[in-house]
Amino acid sequence: MVNQQPELHSQISINGSIIIVVCHQGFMSAKDKFHDVVKIALQKEGWQITDDPLSISVGGVDMLIDLGAERLLAAERQGEKIAVEIKSFLNTSAITDFHLAVGQFINYRTALKFKDPQRQLFLAIPLTAYNDFFKREFTTAVIEDYQFKLLVYDVEQEVISLWKK
C-alpha cells in the first residue's frame, strides 16, 4: 500500500496575478495564468503538447521543471520538438526575474542535451516584458551570448507574437 500524502493548496496574489500552489509528496508546483496562455497559443499554431510538465533526470539530479509560477511544456509539430520555459515577469524587479530565468534556462538546456538533444529549448516571455525589458542593451547581450531562443506571447490575444531563434 502506498502512503499518500494529502495535497495542500494555497492561493497567492502577486501584482494582480493569482498563483495556485499545490504541494504533494514533497514536491511543489505552481501555475499562473500565463501557463495556459502559452499552451493555447502553441496549440493554435499546430503544436501538440506531449509533456506537461517535462520531467528530466540527469546525473543524479531530478528536475520536475515546474518552478515558482512557471512550467516547462514539451511540444511537437511536424517532427520538430521543443521545450518551453514560461516566465511571467510580474515581479517589481525585472532583473531579478531575468537572473532566475537565465539560470533555469542554462540548467534546462544542459539537461536536455543529455536526455533529449533534438528538443530545442525556448524561453517564453510576455510581449510587454519583451518590449519593456528584453530590448535593452544588457538583456540583448545576455540573450545573444547564451544563444537563447525566445517565444514572445501576447497575454490578451493568447497568441505567439514572435519566435526569435
Segments predicted by a language model, with ranges:
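Charged phosphate-binding loop/patch that engages nucleotide di/tri-phosphates or the phosphate backbone
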Residues: 3-15, 149-165
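Acidic-basic catalytic patches of nuclease active cores, encompassing PD-(D/E)XK
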Residues: 14, 18-59, 75
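Active-site metal-binding core of divalent-cation-utilizing nuclease and nuclease-like domains
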Residues: 48-82, 97, 164
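Hydrophobic/aromatic beta-strand patches that form the interior of the parallel beta-sheet core
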Residues: 82-84, 122, 149-151
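Short beta-strand-loop-alpha-helix junction that forms the active-site gateway
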Residues: 86-98
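Nucleic-acid nuclease catalytic cores
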Residues: 98, 110-145, 153-155
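A general alpha-helical scaffold signature found inside nucleotide-binding enzyme cores
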Residues: 100-103
